[in-house]
């Protein structure tokens, strides 16, 4: 029996996941794996955070934090984001696991012992200003192949070619922006030319997407060169050699990161009490395992050339139980890029749909549905808010949701919620049952060919067929004159509903589960159709999907996108909505904070009302009701359930209060600790994301920056502010 080892590209633990990431490597893999599980296949789905990339060191340097603090924060955030998006990894690990250090060093030593490494003293990028060797990604310049400017020194994001700082045109330091120099430094290189012929023969036999196969073969034809696999960096896996010129150096992340697929698999099976089970997935023991890597287009060279070469360089794995070669990738489904409103996603300019923020406003199934319908399988595609709204409302709500609701409404209204017996079938009835069988076959074939967009379209065509069938049979009319005919119509409609409950599972797991609940089923879902028996009792109908409103989209843009990219948010709002509608939504959603929120995008906005030529006043008696006191922050912790909140403890002299404060974007924990602050002490306690807040810190907010209010000299804790 064939078994599947499925991976998604390891995300860098230096920032959150955006919709482009999800559509590229994670949602496609999840659809594929969920289908295999429904088929009863032997499949393991692995991923984890890549925690030694130079972007992590770069971010830590910029923020004055340690790399470990960065990776711990984003590992947890990314893991929770995937859970919320219903990405069903068997295990989500990390490359800071001890097993990953051990295995990565083992891979290096095996390649070293097998003669595939060579030490060379070469010129390495060095910044005279920052007094440090620069990893490739810390160097930016113009790509010599396509002329794209501001490309990092490891790969061009435009043409996809691997780069080195030496070949960049006008290279400069990404930290300070100054021109760089090159200094001598010893490093180990992998002799890629050792594997060129073997790689070519192997790739020619693989069932890869044409865009992947053609790109990779052309690179091999141009000639493979030696590539450095060690770096001058203080964060990463140490080079496992006792050589003077290797001290303080680490394994290059592009060498050790893909080894994470194996180390995370080992950790997974260790944790479930099967420490040797990983071998049948990663070692070619019986030729029955298919290793499938889901990636984005930018990762093609690393997974199709370098990663297989590392596995070849290791040679045979051998222990007391087994001796075997490593399994090479069976397939590498690589998606193209997703754009946002016609522009490339940009994390630096905050032009992105951050998944954890999007899921604060919209259900996971909505995001999964839309991203699947526009999935960039063979060409770049675009995320558009207007298209998102239309597709959800017309396809999910009006088509799928409407059909399920109609069928359940009729069985409850005319048959007390019991599946009726079928009478004699006519041609359309038989066509409906055949359509169900065809849908299972065709959707499965499309998924196995990584055509997820077409597969979902085929599922939705069954819902459309159901609506047409229902309209043609007109059970609202036959119910008055032909109970048997009506029963047949309702029975077959419910069979279609059950089929949809299974077919939707890979794409919309929440909707699938809800349909299963409404049908009152406890059987395990399988990728096969077994009819609902007559006499089975179903539940009363519930709304499956709610329409997306303009107000929701306006709120999302104002509350999330405008914080990081106010100009981009303003352009979006002006493109789709009247300003008065934006103002109305801001007032409804943000209340007294509406003007502050709106001024992020409309600098000239002013909402304060005037009465008889004078500003409205607050009465002194109302102000006097506030109990404002001086306190001192004595503890700062991350909120366990929110990305932007701290849980702080404030000493008010006679008591210590716990407060929840939205200051994470503006202050580091160490900047808050021991700071004197002003607290609203008699504010009604309120739970924020599951933690009670006993007051509020006062701060000034000009729409861009936030500054805490504090006394200009030390006073007694608990002193009143008058």
Swiss-Prot record:
**MF (Gene Ontology):** ATP binding; metal ion binding; methionine-tRNA ligase activity; tRNA binding
| SUPFAM superfamilies linked | Anticodon-binding domain of a subclass of class I aminoacyl-tRNA synthetases (SSF47323), Methionyl-tRNA synthetase (MetRS), Zn-domain (SSF57770), Nucleic acid-binding proteins (SSF50249), Nucleotidylyl transferase (SSF52374)
Q: Tell me where the sequence motif 'KMSKS' region sits in this chain.
A: 344-348
- Taxonomy, superkingdom: Archaea
Its EC number is 6.1.1.10
GO CC annotation: what is one?
Answer: cytosol
Catalytic reaction equation(s): tRNA(Met) + L-methionine + ATP = L-methionyl-tRNA(Met) + AMP + diphosphate
State where it is primarily located: cytoplasm
Motif: 'HIGH' region; annotated at: 11-21
How the cofactor is bound: the record states: Binds 1 zinc ion per subunit.
Which keywords accompany this UniProt record?
Aminoacyl-tRNA synthetase, ATP-binding, Cytoplasm, Ligase, Metal-binding, Nucleotide-binding, Protein biosynthesis, RNA-binding, tRNA-binding, Zinc
Top-rank EC class of the record's enzyme: ligase
Cofactor(s) listed in the protein's UniProt record: Zn(2+)
Sequence ranges assigned to domain tRNA-binding in this UniProt record: 622-722
The UniProt entry's GO biological process terms, in alphabetical order, are: methionyl-tRNA aminoacylation
Which compartments is it annotated to reside in? Cytoplasm
Residues bound to ATP are 347
Protein residues bound to Zn(2+): 143, 146, 156, 159
Share what the entry says about its subunit structure, partners included: Homodimer.
Q: Which family does the record assign?
A: Belongs to the class-I aminoacyl-tRNA synthetase family. MetG type 1 subfamily.
Report the protein's function.
Is required not only for elongation of protein synthesis but also for the initiation of all mRNA translation through initiator tRNA(fMet) aminoacylation.
Which protein is depicted?
Methionine--tRNA ligase
Origin organism of this chain? Pyrococcus abyssi (strain GE5 / Orsay)
Q: Taxonomic lineage of this organism?
A: Archaea, Methanobacteriati, Methanobacteriota, Thermococci, Thermococcales
